[in-house]
Amino acid sequence: MKLKTKEDIGAPIEYVFGAVSDFETFQRQALRRGAEVARLDTLDQPGVGVAWDIAFGFRGKRRQVQIELIEYEPPTRMLFDSRMTGMTGQLAVELMALSKTRTRLILELELVPENLSARLLVQSLKLARGAIDKRAQVRVADWAKGVEDRYTKMV
């Protein structure tokens, strides 16, 4: 199953990449939403090898996922690999400079089930695809608006 969303942001690509690679902020957001997040690496800067172990509730079950940054190409691309029981996934984060002060963010998530229960989970996600796409688009748009606002205040 593949999900894709894109959003244009009124800020330079370097600024947007800094925001999208601010992993500590994303960790705090996950913690506020009830997830348990443990950083597995000892790196003090973003880069290949940054990894997390995340536990969260989803569809009535406790899920655990390990995520690792496997490609890091500032300021244009990051690729994350994820593994959970019965499923693997990849999240690609790509940035494209549209102008000096405008950047396009493209997020692509691919989930690959490896057993029957994971297939059933992915199938249920496919059935709710419209709602999931809409929710993802709203979240990304809200995040992008926040980045734009912070950039505008800074300039």
Which sequence ranges carry the predicted segments?
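Hydrophobic-ligand-binding modules of eukaryotic lipid transfer/binding families
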Residues: 1-8, 102, 137, 141, ...
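Hydrophobic ligand-binding cavity/cleft-lining segments
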Residues: 1-45
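Short, surface-exposed coil-to-beta transition loops
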Residues: 2-4, 62-67, 87-92
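Generic structural detector for well-ordered beta-strands
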Residues: 4-10, 55, 68, 94
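A short, structured loop/turn motif at beta-sheet edges
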Residues: 13, 45, 70-75, 94-104
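Glycine-rich portal/gate segments that line the openings of hydrophobic small-molecule binding cavities
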Residues: 38-85, 138-155
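Beta-strand/loop substructures that line and gate deep hydrophobic ligand-binding cavities in soluble
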Residues: 81-134
